[in-house]
UniProtKB/Swiss-Prot annotation:
<keyword id="KW-0488">Methylation</keyword>
<dbReference type="GO" id="GO:1990830">
    <property type="term" value="P:cellular response to leukemia inhibitory factor"/>
</dbReference>
<dbReference type="GO" id="GO:0098882">
    <property type="term" value="F:structural constituent of presynaptic active zone"/>
</dbReference>
<feature type="binding site">
    <location>
        <begin position="321"/>
        <end position="324"/>
    </location>
    <ligand>
        <name>NAD(+)</name>
    </ligand>
</feature>
<dbReference type="GO" id="GO:0044877">
    <property type="term" value="F:protein-containing complex binding"/>
</dbReference>
<dbReference type="Pfam" id="PF02826">
    <property type="entry name" value="2-Hacid_dh_C"/>
</dbReference>
<dbReference type="GO" id="GO:0019901">
    <property type="term" value="F:protein kinase binding"/>
</dbReference>
<dbReference type="GO" id="GO:0001221">
    <property type="term" value="F:transcription coregulator binding"/>
</dbReference>
<dbReference type="GO" id="GO:0098982">
    <property type="term" value="C:GABA-ergic synapse"/>
</dbReference>
<keyword id="KW-0597">Phosphoprotein</keyword>
<dbReference type="GO" id="GO:0006357">
    <property type="term" value="P:regulation of transcription by RNA polymerase II"/>
</dbReference>
<comment type="function">
    <text>Corepressor targeting diverse transcription regulators. Functions in brown adipose tissue (BAT) differentiation. Isoform 2 probably acts as a scaffold for specialized synapses.</text>
</comment>
<dbReference type="GO" id="GO:0042974">
    <property type="term" value="F:nuclear retinoic acid receptor binding"/>
</dbReference>
<dbReference type="GO" id="GO:0050872">
    <property type="term" value="P:white fat cell differentiation"/>
</dbReference>
<feature type="active site">
    <location>
        <position position="301"/>
    </location>
</feature>
<feature type="binding site">
    <location>
        <begin position="186"/>
        <end position="191"/>
    </location>
    <ligand>
        <name>NAD(+)</name>
    </ligand>
</feature>
<dbReference type="InterPro" id="IPR006140">
    <property type="entry name" value="D-isomer_DH_NAD-bd"/>
</dbReference>
């Protein structure tokens, strides 16, 4: 009776340790086809040809996990998503088999990547997605603020008569020359650099602030680097945001930083809505401290002028988070996302993934020393294997690759293969010994 209780305690201890470990995606003739889901869309025509030979692809068209089908929550091993759905820790815990999420785009602030990593879910993005489109849209917004094209168009649509010089002065009030103006870029990654190249062609002097970037890039692009945000805000006639959103830079543009900007400067944001405190921006626009602003992203999306702090703000251009979009960019992003899912299925997570953003939080296995070896299936315990318990390591002549994976809780594997033959005696003295071989019996010191 005492022996039974002892084994029961060991089993419970192993179950607790392995509770957070998710298996690698099982792929092959001995396993059912893995399920991959597009969470917040309904068109899978691009993804299907890339994945159809090894996975079942489904769509959910959901805006929250409450709208996701139960089969996807229980069985999906891979998920693709745009920016229109948010996954918190609570949401991620609802997925029972999920191993990889690919964000179809560059930003991933709508996924709790730390919680995902701790749950054994890799999160990937497409960092080169729509760089040209976003840069082009940003420059369009900048030109619009300087040349007032949007307001001139609106005046004509409203029936304003523009004929005399006085009428032109009135309707085009605020239009400014670009040459010699200073454009300040906060964040100087792919998109920031693309904006700099375009802006220089229009006559801007370009400066940037990016505390994470190594020195030297400014020389190759002929721009100037500043080393504090305050310096950038003070020197810039137009400020454009090109950084990811995180807990450190939320509301980077707020009442305090706006007061450090030049009187009458412009502000452009095609990065993330949470970077700008919209209440502070609205007040600055009304007071004229900021001459004009152009926003493609907003704190609350989908954006509406009918509500929120910006509804009465003057000199404001807003677009509905579309700076990234072109037919070509959309196609490339979807192909890249499906290809990353394919890497996850055919390779190992996260090692095989090209753009995993949460490796530092990732939990893949438990150290050997904390798991009782006797709970491991006998065939997988012995001289041939030395891997963390629960992970089936494949040695020459052992299990086929299709059987490689994690066995939660040490559940026995059922297969028709012969058992692994272990040496019954020590090797011959004449047999060479490989130094550093890690495959000795785990109990041997």
């Amino acid at each position: 009776m005492a022996l039974v209780d002892k084994h029961k305690v060991k089993r419970q201890r192993l179950d607790r340790i392995c509770e957070g470990i998710r298996p690698q995606i099982m792929n092959g003739p001995l396993h059912p086809r893995p399920l991959v889901a597009l969470l917040d869309g309904r068109d899978c025509t691009v993804e299907m040809p890339i994945l159809k030979d090894l996975a079942t692809v489904a769509f959910c068209d959901a805006q929250s996990t409450q709208e996701i089908h139960e089969k996807v929550l229980n069985e999906a091993v891979g998920a693709m998503m745009y920016h229109t759905i948010t996954l918190t820790r609570e949401d991620l815990e609802k997925f029972k088999a999920l191993r990889v999420i690919v964000r179809i785009g560059s930003g991933y602030d709508n996924v709790d990547i730390k919680a995902a990593g701790e749950l054994g879910i890799a999160v990937c993005n497409i960092p080169s997605a729509a760089v040209e489109e976003t840069a082009d849209s940003t420059v369009c917004h900048i030109l619009n603020l300087y040349r007032r094209n949007t307001w001139l168009y609106q005046a004509l649509r409203e029936g304003t008569r523009v004929q005399s010089v006085e009428q032109i002065r009135e309707v085009a009030s605020g239009a400014a020359r670009i040459r010699g103006e200073t454009l300040g870029l906060i964040g100087f990654g792919r998109t920031g650099q693309a904006v700099a190249v375009r802006a220089k062609a229009f006559g801007f002097s370009v400066i940037f602030y990016d505390p994470y970037l190594q020195d030297g890039i400014e020389r190759s692009l002929g721009v100037q680097r500043v080393y504090t945000l305050q310096d950038l805000l003070y020197q810039s006639d137009c400020v454009s945001l090109h950084c990811n959103l995180n807990e450190h830079n939320h509301h980077l543009i707020n009442d305090f930083t706006i007061k450090q900007m030049r009187q009458g400067a412009f502000l452009v944001n095609a990065a993330r809505g949470g970077l700008v405190d919209e209440k502070a921006l609205a007040q600055a626009l009304k007071e004229g401290r900021i001459r004009g602003a152009a926003l493609d992203v907003h704190e609350s999306e989908p954006f509406s002028f009918a509500q929120g702090p910006l509804k009465d703000a003057p000199n404001l251009i807003c677009t509905p988070h579309t700076a990234w979009y072109s037919e070509q960019a959309s196609l490339e992003m979807r192909e890249a996302a499906a290809t990353e899912i394919r890497r996850a299925i055919t390779g190992r997570i996260p090692e095989s993934l090209r753009n995993c953003v949460n490796k530092e939080f990732f939990v893949t296995s438990t150290p050997w020393s904390v798991i009782d070896q006797q709970a491991i299936h006998p065939e997988l315990n012995g001289a041939t294997y030395r891997y963390p318990p629960g992970i089936v390591g494949v040695a020459p002549g052992g299990l086929p690759p299709a059987m490689e994976g994690i066995i939660p809780g040490g559940i026995p594997v059922t297969h028709n293969l012969p058992t692994v033959a272990h040496p019954s005696q020590a090797p011959s003295p004449n047999q060479p010994t490989k130094h550093g071989d890690n495959r000795e019996h785990p109990n041997e010191q």
